[in-house]
Amino acid sequence: MKVIKTLLVSTLALVSLAACKTVPSYSSDYTQADHKIQGINLTDQQALDIGTRFVAAFNTLGTPAFVKQASNLYADQLFINDTLSQFSQKKDLVQHFQGMNNRVSNVSVKLISATHHQDSAYIHWQMAYDFKMFGRTKTMDSYGISEIKINQANQIIFQQDFWDPANGLYRSLPLIGGAYGWILPFKKSL
């Protein structure tokens, strides 16, 4: 049994390291887009309005209304990185949304706070949803912050999501979650 565990861990580590080598970090893309893309300077009320529209649209995730409502938030040319995917064209983002929409249900998104600095709104949110994968449905819950810049038409031209996929997704996936938790157990000290 120990040999099997060792082989499993070694294989998983090798695959993980290989994936890390072939997938570039998004940090340089974020830095470049953040400097290049200029939104409008925001007020407190505009930041709150951005958060309210964002949460309202994503509360329809998993319903027929979602793709249209979410699509209306975004400009044709944009930078969006949600930690798992990156897009620069609205059409590609909408296609991604269509796929997401087929896998989730019972979505609840709450706006915790909205603040801003110059042209960036920082939207702090909580999202809970049921996620279908491999024929099973799992309830997920995560917190995150989205940095959002908008243009004069109030469309999102820049969005960088900061959230913890380990807690919000990886640990909850069938098969993968168990292996992830075994290799990197959650540590809690009170």
What do the PLM-derived regions correspond to, one by one?
Residues 1-8:
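Bacterial N-terminal signal peptides that target proteins for export
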Residues 15-19:
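C-terminal motif of bacterial Sec signal peptides marking the signal peptidase cleavage site
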Residues 20-68, 72, 190:
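Short, low-complexity N-terminal intrinsically disordered segments enriched in polar/charged residues
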Residues 21-39, 102-108, 112-190:
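A beta-strand edge to alpha-helix "cap/lid" segment located at domain peripheries
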Residues 51-58, 74, 97, 127, ...:
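Hydrophobic alpha-helical core bundles mediating ligand binding, dimerization, or RNAP-core interactions
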Residues 60, 79-80, 132:
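General structural signal for alpha-helix termini and helix-helix connectors
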Residues 67-72, 76-118:
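A solvent-exposed, acidic/Ser-Thr-rich amphipathic alpha-helical stretch
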